[in-house]
Structure formats: structure tokens, C-alpha cells
Amino acid sequence: MVKVLLVGGGGREHAIGEALVKGGAELYVVSKHKNPGLARIAKDYGLARETDVEKVVEFAEKWKVDFAFIGPEAPLEAGVVNALEERGIPAVGPTKEAARLETNKAWAREFMERNKIPGRKLFRVFDDPKEMKEWIDEFGKPVVVKPLGLTGGKGVKVVGYQLKDNEEAKEYAEYLIRKDGKVLIEERTDGVEFTFQVFSDGKKVVPMPLAQDYPHAYEGDVGPITGGMGSYSCSNHLLPFITKSDWEKALETLQKTVEAMYKEGYPYKGILYGQFMLSKDGPVIIEYNARFGDPEAINVLSILEDNLVEISERIIDGNLRDVKFSNMATVVKYIAPQGYPENPIKGVRIEVNEDKIREEGARLIFASIDENYTLLGSRALAVVGVSENLEEAEKIAQSAIRHVKGPIFYRKDVGTRESIEKRIKIMKSLRGDFDVNSC
């Protein structure tokens, strides 16, 4: 049996763990709190901060694992892959240097510029408030202001959304320069965002089905940005507003990225996630993530037909082949504590009827919750509906939520026809009429 160490204890990692066990792995987990879903399927469980590299390596050596699979971004930034590889333990996940695609936004933008990656945005990095203000005034169009490190997607502010105008953008950018020493300013791109995740063996990429995330806290895409309140994917692995040509361009961006990383001496092995904006001119890369999306990992792993252990071994050995996914639609809805993300309640027990959820045909994924169903303050559970069409998948996920009771909060509109029509409408306003893909 292949012994696999999984680092991380969120919903994404529960989905990864289930896929590894289904592929025949003997699973070992290290995370800062015990995920009840992972605890049920793991041979052993080590409690430690995922960024405590020495501790992670210690567990890996104690359990004599064959390889590691890294779930979240923080341990990648901490260099957990480098440390494991130094001890002869291969990993699915990029080294600290390769993970800069996510962990250092300025480096990533400069890398894209150096290598002429298609779909890149206009950007500037500033450490001088005066220069920054002059540039924004001269640019004269709406901008996006981004902090440079890992922010869990929460520090990015866009003119016309979180910022009233470029004047407010200058104030926020100045605050970030004072706080972090630097700030990243980009042109604003209008359109609809989508997620394109690929497996990478260092030289080539293999695509997964596209997904679309719902980052805003509240229905109708308003409110603060969260880690993601849910996501959907379509049975044809595209999205209703994406053409085959858009898909090919986005894939080219990711393939060229991996080729350029190899050329620069940082072979990228693991999962690469491109967050794209579909603009009127085609897909623009908003940012990279150096790991699976959470929730989008749950969508794609729910319909993975091939064996994740074998895929992982091929990533490590550098000989990836195409990967098969079933032609099913998926809807993932996250359940969070009331008050999330700004002021979530914690320490309260909720009722979860797992048998009834299964009877609805849904899967239950555990995240920030303990084995007594006590809320730990972040997204707690995800319910997953899988069916031949999106309506049916959404119904399954929605009906499962009835069997979770307590001070919870979720978005009813994730994966609904209305919410998707809204996105199609945005694209039609930018591109004119087009043939919509069925989902």
C-alpha cells in the first residue's frame, strides 16, 4: 500500500484525502485541528501547524510515507516541499521558489512580463506613495490595489466595488505601502471570473474541468470577499459563457507558465490554479494559486474517474498523462457560522444529520468543525450535489442543507440558473450575443 502524507485540514483537504484513499492510499494527515472527515479515513493523525516545517517532516519520517500531498498555500510558502525533498520524500506541490507564483504577487507579475505570458495584465509595483499617485493619475482608468503577500484573497480592492474611485484607491495603496513597504497596482479588467485548475509535472499541464466560485459573502454577489461560499462545474467541463477558443487560450496561458518556470529553473510540480477574468478580448489571468481551490477542488475531485494516487506519482515522476473526469455537473455549497466572515460565532454546536444528507444523494465535506459538530469560526461544512445536469446537482446540494440545523449561514443562490444567467448577461453586455453552452 502506498503511504501518503496529506498536509492540511480544511474542506479542500477532506476532498483530497477521500480521493487518495479511493485510489488505494494509506492516509496520514498533519493539520492544526483534527478534521473529523479526515480522522475517519486516516491511519494516523498528527496535530501541528501546517507551517511548522520541522514538525511536518518529523511526522513524515515517523510514518515512513512514500510521498506527501500539500493542500494549502501557507506550508508551500514556508518551504515544506523543499524540506521534505531534502529528506528524500517527494511531494505534490511546488517548492517555496515555484510557489512564488501565488505567494509573491509582484514576482508573479514580473515573471509574466519577462516571459510574455499570454493574457497578462498591465501592472506596476510601487514603494513610493508620490510615484504611485502620479502613475494612477496619469493612467486615468480604474485600478485594482493588491497587497503583495498571501491574504487569503481578502486584501484585494477594486475601484467601482470596494473602492469608490481612484482617489480612494490612492489612499488604500498608500496605507499598504506604509504597512508592507510595497503595493501592486493593476488595470481593472471587466468581465466574469472563472477557475481553471491543472495538474503539472514540471513540463506539461493536464486540464481539469472549469469551475466558477462565489467569493462574496451574500446572495446576489454582494458583501465582503470570503474564501468562497460555493462553486459549480458543468457536465461538458466548460462554463455557459466560455467558448472552446477561450478555453484553449486560458490553457495556453497555464502551459506557457509551466514551460517558463521550467526554463527559469523552478520546475512547477503539483496543482496550478489560474484565476481568470473572461474579458471582451478573451481570458486575462487575474492571479495564480499554487494549489487546489477551496471550494473548487471539491467540484473536480467529486467527478475524478482516474486514480489520484497514480496521478500524484506521475506528477512526481514527470510523466503525466491525460486525466479522466465523468461528464457530470457539480454544485458545492459551503455552510459557515452566522456572522462569517467578519464576526463569526464560534464554539456553538450544530445538528448535522449525516444519514439524511446521504439519503438526499449529497456528499458531506468537513472543514472548520470538530467531531462534536462544534463550529470553529470559519467555513464549517460543504454539501456537494453531483448529477447529469446543473439544476439537479443544485437541488441535491440545497436539499441536503435542510439536515444541518443551528446558527448557520450559506448562499442559496450558488449554482442556480438565475445566478448563472446574471453572469451570461454580463458577458453579453461586453461581447454582444453568443451561443451559450448548456450546463
UniProtKB/Swiss-Prot annotation:
What chemistry does it catalyse, as a reaction equation? 5-phospho-beta-D-ribosylamine + glycine + ATP = N(1)-(5-phospho-beta-D-ribosyl)glycinamide + ADP + phosphate + H(+)
The family note in this entry says: Belongs to the GARS family.
**GO MF:** ATP binding; metal ion binding; phosphoribosylamine-glycine ligase activity
Residues engaged in binding Mg(2+) 1:
275, 287
Query: Which domain of life does this protein belong to?
Result: Archaea
In this chain, Mg(2+) 2 is annotated as bound at 287, 289
The source organism is: Pyrococcus furiosus (strain ATCC 43587 / DSM 3638 / JCM 8422 / Vc1)
What InterPro entries does the record point to? Answer: ATP-grasp, ATP_grasp_subdomain_1, PreATP-grasp_dom_sf, PRibGlycinamid_synth_ATP-grasp, PRibGlycinamide_synth, PRibGlycinamide_synth_C-dom, PRibGlycinamide_synth_C_sf, PRibGlycinamide_synth_CS
State its Enzyme Commission number(s): 6.3.4.13
Gene3D superfamilies, alphabetized: 3.40.50.20, ATP-grasp fold, A domain, ATP-grasp fold, B domain, Phosphoribosylglycinamide synthetase, C-terminal domain
What keywords appear on the UniProt entry?
ATP-binding, Ligase, Magnesium, Manganese, Metal-binding, Nucleotide-binding, Purine biosynthesis
This protein's pathway: Purine metabolism; IMP biosynthesis via de novo pathway; N(1)-(5-phospho-D-ribosyl)glycinamide from 5-phospho-alpha-D-ribose 1-diphosphate: step 2/2
Gene Ontology BP annotations: 'de novo' IMP biosynthetic process; purine nucleobase biosynthetic process
Q: Does the keyword Ligase apply?
A: yes
Q: What is this protein called?
A: Phosphoribosylamine--glycine ligase
Which residues are listed for Mn(2+) 1 binding in this entry?
275, 287
Gene behind this chain? purD
The annotation note on the cofactor reads: Binds 2 magnesium or manganese ions per subunit.
